[in-house]
Amino acid sequence: MFKLTSRLVTSRFAASSRLATARTIVLPRPHPSWISFQAKRFNSTGPNANDVSEIQTQLPSIDELTSSAPSLSASTSDLIANTTQTVGELSSHIGYLNSIGLAQTWYWPSDIIQHVLEAVHVYSGLPWWGTIAATTILIRCLMFPLYVKSSDTVARNSHIKPELDALNNKLMSTTDLQQGQLVAMQRKKLLSSHGIKNRWLAAPMLQIPIALGFFNALRHMANYPVDGFANQGVAWFTDLTQADPYLGLQVITAAVFISFTRLGGETGAQQFSSPMKRLFTILPIISIPATMNLSSAVVLYFAFNGAFSVLQTMILRNKWVRSKLKITEVAKPRTPIAGASPTENMGIFQSLKHNIQKARDQAERRQLMQDNEKKLQESFKEKRQNSKIKIVHKSNFINNKK
């Protein structure tokens, strides 16, 4: 019995030992990555002395960082400066305005002005405020000979002003066609005898399309805005796309326009009446609030154009310049001849009312002259019809006799 029990225990122990051996064999071996991971984990708690010394030598100290701070700020400022310099580089090439939809033609005034502005800006290297000023002065210099001829014509007219006013009043007051033609011939003879060609009086009118071209060109360029317009101003108006916050340009423009009007206009020879002088004093003052919302680029053109007008007026009023350019001296005002209607002592509104009534009377007289001309033509046709010779055939004469 005991032997049987011992055999059973021995057999069970042997079986369990074999099972344990089998389990030991079946268990998988750990992966090398796990071992390396565990090794790295345990190694992190105890760093190598060589690694620590290498890190310490590579990292800069606090003193080194503090000493390098000025150089870092200097490099940052240089980067900002270089970035600022790149602004405006796009507009320094011919064709830039055309690429953004501006300066499309060569016949429209604003497009022509934009082409000229771009050429001056690219080839001169001036900032945009200098480009506007230089272009304005360049165009006014090209127009100076026309103003010289206009000034000479105005001065020649001043010598015959009383006689010319009398003939003009006769021409406007007559209702007889033949009498009007006779007065017109007398007026033409008077002008030709003094070498006067009134077509030169229209020379300053060329400034109107040029001024409108500048206005539209600069307004579109500021609204886009053109590259460089936002930072290539000067003084207190560095941004040409915005309105002048202090209205300084508007005040300067009004002052220069009043000045050259007082000096005798752009030809330096015009003699404005008192009502016209008062009118040309009030209008520039009214223009200050009217132009307060315009961009600085537009008002800058007005300011430089007005300043050049003052300079031109002072030059054309100089006696030495007039003698060198062979410009006739302006005659002093004389007493009007009978038949002239001076309006020197009238106020602004009285003068305006007088001119309106004068234009109305002139229109009525013109209509009356046209009616008289039609009546003369009809009477002439009737007389011509009655004066025709009637041809009578012999057969008709015999028949009538029978």
Swiss-Prot record:
Q: What are the record's GO terms for cellular component? A: mitochondrial crista; mitochondrial inner boundary membrane; mitochondrial inner membrane; mitochondrion
Q: What are the UniProt keywords, alphabetically?
A: Membrane, Mitochondrion, Mitochondrion inner membrane, Transit peptide, Transmembrane, Transmembrane helix
User: Has UniProt tagged this entry with the keyword Mitochondrion?
Assistant: yes
| Example of a GO MF term | mitochondrial ribosome binding
- Consequence when changing residue 213 to R: Leads to a defect in complex V assembly and subsequent respiratory deficiency
Transmembrane ranges?
119-139, 200-220, 240-260, 276-292, 298-316
Instruction: Give the Mitochondrial intermembrane membrane side ranges.
Output: 43-118, 221-239, 293-297
Stretches assigned to the Mitochondrial matrix side: 140-199, 261-275, 317-402
Topology in the lipid bilayer is annotated as:
Multi-pass membrane protein
What range is the organelle transit peptide?
1-42
Localisation per UniProt entry = Mitochondrion inner membrane
The extra comment attached to this record reads: Present with 6550 molecules/cell in log phase SD medium.
Q: What does this protein do?
A: Mitochondrial inner membrane insertase that mediates the insertion of both mitochondrion-encoded precursors and nuclear-encoded proteins from the matrix into the inner membrane. Links mitoribosomes with the inner membrane. Forms pores capable of accommodating translocating protein segments. Essential for the activity and assembly of cytochrome c oxidase. Plays a central role in the translocation and export of the N-terminal part of the COX2 protein into the mitochondrial intermembrane space.
The molecule here is called Mitochondrial inner membrane protein OXA1
What's the gene?
A: OXA1
